[in-house]
Every structure is written in C-alpha cells, then in structure tokens.
Amino acid sequence: MRIVLITGISGSGKSVALNALEDAGYYCVDNLPPHVLPELARYLAQDGQRRLAVAIDARSSASLDEMPGLIRELSREHDVRVLFLNASTQALIQRFSETRRRHPLSGSLSHDADVGLLSSLEEAIERERELVAPLAEFGHQIDTSTLRANALRTWVKRFIEQKNNDLMVMFESFGFKRGVPLDADLMFDVRALPNPYYDHQLRPLTGLDQPVIAFLDALPIVHQMIDDIHAFLMKWLPHFRDDNRSYLTVAIGCTGGQHRSVFIAETLAARLAREANVIVRHRDAPVDVDASSRLVSEVDRP
C-alpha cells in the first residue's frame, strides 16, 4: 500500500494537500491519532485499498513521540512517504488573520489588543514547531510561504508521481531578496554570475525562456558553476542515500529568482534525472503553475 503522511505547521496547507490526494484517489483521514495508523493500514489493505493519506498535526501531540517508530514499522510493509509542510511565521499569521481561524494550540486568544493577539498566535506557532520538529527529518519539506493553493495542489501531484521510494531530489530556484527557503538542505549562491536582468530585452523573461537560456548557455563561467555543483552532488548523493535519506532539497539562489537560478536549477535537474527522482520548483519566478513545479524524467535530460 502507498501511504502518504502529511504533517507540519497549522496553516501551512495540510488540508489543501489532503484534498489533492483525495482527488488523486487516496483514502484520506484528517487528524488521525498516530497510534491508530498501523491498525487502519492493516484494515484498509485487507479491504483492498491501495492508497492511504493521513494528516497528522500537533493536536495529536500526546502521540507524536511514537511517530518515528511507527514510520519505520510501516515502511517494512508499505511504501511510506512523508510530506512536511512549513511556512514562515509572518505568512502563517497573515493566513490565520485572513481566515479568522484560531490556531489549534492557541488556547484563548485575547482580542482586546492586536499586539496581544499576535503575541499569543506567535507563541502557539513556535510551540507547534517544537512539537512537530522531530517529524521533519522523516519527510520531504516544502516551504509554502509563497505558494498559492493551486500551486501546492500541483506540487503534491508531482510528489506522488515518483515511481519508487528512492532518494528524491528537489531543485528549488529562489531569489535572495525574498528570503531563503525554509526547506533547503543544501544552498548554492549563483549571484556571482552575469545577470540577464541588465539586458532590457531579457529582463521581463525567465530562465525558462529561450533568449535567457541562450544568453547564459554561452557563458563558460556559468557552465563552470553548474559543473562544480553537479560534481559536488554526484560525490555526496551516495552518502545521503547511505544515511537513509529519502528527500533532499537543493536550493539555487540568485538576486530575484527569475533568470540565473531558474536556468541552473533546470540544467542540474535534467543532469541528475538518471541518478535520482528529481523535482524542480521555481519559487519566485513569474511562471505558470505547471512550469513552477514538475517532476523531471530522463527524457528531459539534454
């Protein structure tokens, strides 16, 4: 059975992810107490169910300590994948404010003063981060701070499309001026490379557009940077596998996240498609949803 566990911070999009999995044919359960999970998996497997998705959050805090052991136990018999959703505190506060929902750990929030409300909400968010932190190492982390709901649904679809449970590598382009990704395991700064932004004809384009590709592809220093990063990854990916890592996020950053980082993330993703399951995501580039997050196959390899 394929089991997808969705966990992370409240307000980061767990309900959106669960709905996307339900649309994909998964039997979905929200806020399941962790200790019930093995029994539920056995029952559904006997009943012929082949896909199960479960959302687990800090409301199950009394049982969260059991999760690492449960994940290992379930992985002996099932294809278990863990998706850990995260977001910046600022983004979470804005979402709770817009939806007028109360954080599940907030207790009684005072509405007498905005400062008191935000302080209580911030404390609840930080407390939840502490509670679910041990689960982050088991899952593929995704920073949803800048993701719209439809983009997250597309990303979840790509996540479940990988064909096996081998190491998944996500190349994530981003712009430093919008902050570094919360989900990065490795980060490479490519701001030292020539910037297409200063060519007025290239400025409105992205690293997915042919004129920008031609501009960067013609520069030896760009290929040197790509070759060096690729060599580093090829050397160390086997060690990540030996450490039983299932997921690795490689962030590639330039100034705005539109030209250089996009081109380099795409190029590296295509090169590594034969070595691992690869997803490429463009956090800050103004591209459509399908282009912003996609699974890379060997046919994409140049």
Swiss-Prot record:
Listed InterPro entries: P-loop_NTPase, RapZ-like, RapZ-like_N, RapZ_C
Domain of life: Bacteria
Amino-acid positions noted as binding GTP in the UniProt annotation, renumbered to this chain: 57-60
Annotated residues for binding of ATP: 8-15
Gene3D superfamilies in alphabetical order: P-loop containing nucleotide triphosphate hydrolases
UniProt keyword terms in alphabetical order: ATP-binding, GTP-binding, Nucleotide-binding
GO molecular function: ATP binding; GTP binding
Protein task: Displays ATPase and GTPase activities.
Cross-referenced PANTHER family: RNASE ADAPTER PROTEIN RAPZ
Family: Belongs to the RapZ-like family.
NCBIfam families referenced in this protein's UniProt entry, alphabetically: PRK05416.1
Descriptive protein name: Nucleotide-binding protein BceJ2315_08000
Record organism: Burkholderia cenocepacia (strain ATCC BAA-245 / DSM 16553 / LMG 16656 / NCTC 13227 / J2315 / CF5610) (Burkholderia cepacia (strain J2315))
Taxonomic lineage: Bacteria, Pseudomonadati, Pseudomonadota, Betaproteobacteria, Burkholderiales
